[in-house]
């Protein structure tokens, strides 16, 4: 395929260190041309952070780059190979509709993948058309930016362009391409892929590359591959705890959707929980609740065990010793996760120090919330501003008893009630991407071409801890008829 390389001063400063790996890990692939690209949304704060030129990206040439019609001169476009356990079953995968243009080096020296998602067929498309629809791309843009504002590690969304194409799914939909920005796209599934179909030398090359790119600070006397495993476990323990603290349900925690660098990736059937229920599932295909809200920590541990299995040949020359090393490392996940989660829950309740009974206090509150169908986000918001009477828990005997114990707990710390209130305000968001508000924004954009609803939503979501009056509209609960919300893997 003939390359369409151009010199356009977008500010992109691209390298592609990933192509230094053996060719088993990728295939060189140009994006498909699209007939009539138009800019739908551009992320100006992210553009500024990356040191890019917003004016040029808005131009015809800039939009052509975001659509894949033109390729920056220094780009080496590739699709990445990986495998994965999907709902527990192993399969070969790869970038079926995504092209990595390269790695942008920011003025601060940070390295970020720049990927076009929905850019056409690749060798890994497995019969698909490689295209993406506008609605799911806008949805990923909204959710990923909300996650970033909440302080949760995530891939970012730089832009969405419409392609001028119609793509066939169950109905005819408008085509679109998302420009995704990530610290990298190395997944547990990348290691599974080379473990199954590569050599030990290729596995070592990937592990060494990952260490160099993401985990440079290490004691050289340590086993570097054990260090890699331990660091990935730590990052995932932190990430999953942060998901749980805001009621985020990923929906498709396959091993190909677990990044090595600890970023949330692939926002297909994700959603935020309204009413607190550990069994909350939104994905239309997760009929057995494998990826339910309350099961996410267990699934993370399962995925990490699959990652550890890929590293066994590097952990020790003796297979039995390698298994022991891996099992010891994986056994740390539960404790690491719980410590992160407890720390976050204490903050949500204004608690600064640790007491052994804190876990019981927290679990009792969650049990009461579950019993009475309390909204997760708004309950903690009500506790923050001491207006619980406005929630379903107001006047409930069990809650009143719990509230008294909580107040007694707050008096047993040196910090003042005012300090506790400030801690709670910075730990309990006033606004999350409520499913009905996201759908409202998508419907206006996709069906009517009106992006103003989405822009207002994004503005509210960009300041989740502002607790401003203007955000009240976005914190209202859905009507009962819309509570049984289902998501589909369109991204």
Curated annotation (Swiss-Prot):
Q: What is its EC number?
A: 2.7.7.-, 2.7.7.108
Report the source organism: Clostridium botulinum (strain Langeland / NCTC 10281 / Type F)
Q: What does this protein do?
A: Nucleotidyltransferase involved in the post-translational modification of proteins. It can catalyze the addition of adenosine monophosphate (AMP) or uridine monophosphate (UMP) to a protein, resulting in modifications known as AMPylation and UMPylation.
The highest taxon in the source lineage is Bacteria
* Annotated catalytic residues: 256
Q: Which Pfam families match?
A: SelO (PF02696)
Where, in this chain's numbering, is Mg(2+) bound? 257, 266
Q: What is this protein called?
A: Protein nucleotidyltransferase YdiU
């Amino acid at each position: 395929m003939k390359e369409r390389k151009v010199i356009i001063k977008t500010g992109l400063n691209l390298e592609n260190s990933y192509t230094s790996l053996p060719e088993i890990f990728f295939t060189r692939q140009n994006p498909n041309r699209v007939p009539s690209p138009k800019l739908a949304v551009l992320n100006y704060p992210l553009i500024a952070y990356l040191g890019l030129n917003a004016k040029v990206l808005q131009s015809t040439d800039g939009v052509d780059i975001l659509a894949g019609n033109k390729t920056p001169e220094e780009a080496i476009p590739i699709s990445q190979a990986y495998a994965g356990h999907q709902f527990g079953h192993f399969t070969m995968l790869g970038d079926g509709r995504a092209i990595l243009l390269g790695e942008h080096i920011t003025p601060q020296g940070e390295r970020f993948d720049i990927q076009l998602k929905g850019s056409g067929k690749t060798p890994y498309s497995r019969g698909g058309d490689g295209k993406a629809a506008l609605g799911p791309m806008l949805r990923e843009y909204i959710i990923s930016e909300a996650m970033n504002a909440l302080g949760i590690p995530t891939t970012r969304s730089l832009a969405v362009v419409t392609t001028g194409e119609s793509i066939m799914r169950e109905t005819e939909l408008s085509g679109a391409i998302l420009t995704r920005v990530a610290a990298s796209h190395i997944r547990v599934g990348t290691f599974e892929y080379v473990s199954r179909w590569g050599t030990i030398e290729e596995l070592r090359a990937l592990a060494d590359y990952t260490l160099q790119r993401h985990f440079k600070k290490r004691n050289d006397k340590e086993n570097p591959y054990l260090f890699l495993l331990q660091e990935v476990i730590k990052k995932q323990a932190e990430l999953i705890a942060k998901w749980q603290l805001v009621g985020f349900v990923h929906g498709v925690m396959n091993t190909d959707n677990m990044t090595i660098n600890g970023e949330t990736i692939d926002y297909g059937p994700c959603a935020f929980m309204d009413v607190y229920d550990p069994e909350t599932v939104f994905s239309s295909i997760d009929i057995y609740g494998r990826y339910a809200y309350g099961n996410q920590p267990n699934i993370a541990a399962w995925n990490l065990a699959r990652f550890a299995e890929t590293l066994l040949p590097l952990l020790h020359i003796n297979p039995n010793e390698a298994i022991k090393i891996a099992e010891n490392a994986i056994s740390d996940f539960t404790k690491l996760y719980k410590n992160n989660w407890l720390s976050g829950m204490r903050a949500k309740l204004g608690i600064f120090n640790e007491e052994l009974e804190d876990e019981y206090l927290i679990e009792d509150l969650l049990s009461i919330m579950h019993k009475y169908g309390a909204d997760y986000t708004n309950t903690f918001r009500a506790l923050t501003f001491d207006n619980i009477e406005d929630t379903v828990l107001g006047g409930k005997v069990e809650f009143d008893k719990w509230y008294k114990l909580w107040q007694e707990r707050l008096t047993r710390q040196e910090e003042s009630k005012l300090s506790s209130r400030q801690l709670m305000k910075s730990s309990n968001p006033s606004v999350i991407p409520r499913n009905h508000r996201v759908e409202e924004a998508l419907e206006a954009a996709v069906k009517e071409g009106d992006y103003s609803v989405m822009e207002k939503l994004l503005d509210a979501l960009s300041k989740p801890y502002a607790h401003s009056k203007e955000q009240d509209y976005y914190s209202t609960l859905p009507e009962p008829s819309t509570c049984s919300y289902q998501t589909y893997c369109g991204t």
